Amino acid sequence: MMSVRCKASVTWINLLIIMDVRVLLQPAYLLHSLPFQNTSLLVDFFTLDYGRVRAVAKGARREKSKYRSLLQSFHPLLISFSGRGEVKTLGALEPGHAAIPLKGERLFSGLYLNEILCRLLHNHEEHKELYKNYQDTLVALQGNTKMELVLRKFELNLLAELGYAINLEEDCQSHQPINAYCYYRFTPDVGFELIEKIEDGEKNSRIFRGIDLISLRNLEWDEKSSEKAAKRLLRLALATHLGEKPLNSRSLFTSHR
C-alpha cells in the first residue's frame, strides 16, 4: 500500500508536470548535458527545491550564447525554468558563489557523483539534505580530506536519502551488534548476515569482516584492507539500483590512470 507521504510526493510531481511551472533563480548544479537539435543542449540539473530537473537550453551551443560559459560542472548556479511536461525550458542563468575547481582524480570523482545522481534521482523529487551533502562533498574533494573517505560518506548518505540505507549496526537476522571478529554475508537492500564459515565456491565479494564494517560505520580506517572493503561494499549496494550499464566516469578514470 502506498504511504500518505509517497502519495503526496507523487501528487506534487504530477502537478509539476501538468502545470505551466515558472521557477526563478533556483540554486542548482549541472549534472549532465547532451546536444539537442541544431544549437541547443538538453541539460540535467540538481536543484535545491525541485531535485533533478531536465531542461532545454536553447541556443546554448552557439558561440555567443549567454549560457555557454556558465553551463559547467561544479559551478554553483541560479537557474530559472518554465514549461509543462517532464522537460522544461531554461530561462535566466546566473552564477552562484565561486566555482569549485577539481583536478586529476578528484575531477573524475566529481564526475562520478554527477553520473550516479543522474542515474538514481527521479525528476522533480526534492532532496534538500542530499543537495547540501553533494555541495559539501564537492568542497571536501577540493580540499585535503582523503578522497575515498569523502566518496564513501556521500554514497552512504545517497542510499539513505533514497530509502536504501545500509544498516552497519547489526546482523539483519539476529539483530545482534556487528562483531569485529566475525564474518558477514551482505545482501543488497537486506543487510548483513552472520556466517559461521565461508562455503566452498561462495563469492568472496559478498563476505565482509566485522572490523571493516565497523570502520565504515565510523568513517575511519587505518588499514588499506578496510578501505578496499568499504569500496567493494558500496559498489555492491549501488549496483542494484544503477543497473548493468557501466559508468562512464569509471571508464574515464581507468583510462587516465
Where are the model-predicted features located?
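Methionine residue identity
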Residues: M1-M2
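Non-catalytic alpha-helical scaffolds and adjoining flexible linkers that form interface surfaces
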Residues: W12-L41, F46-R257
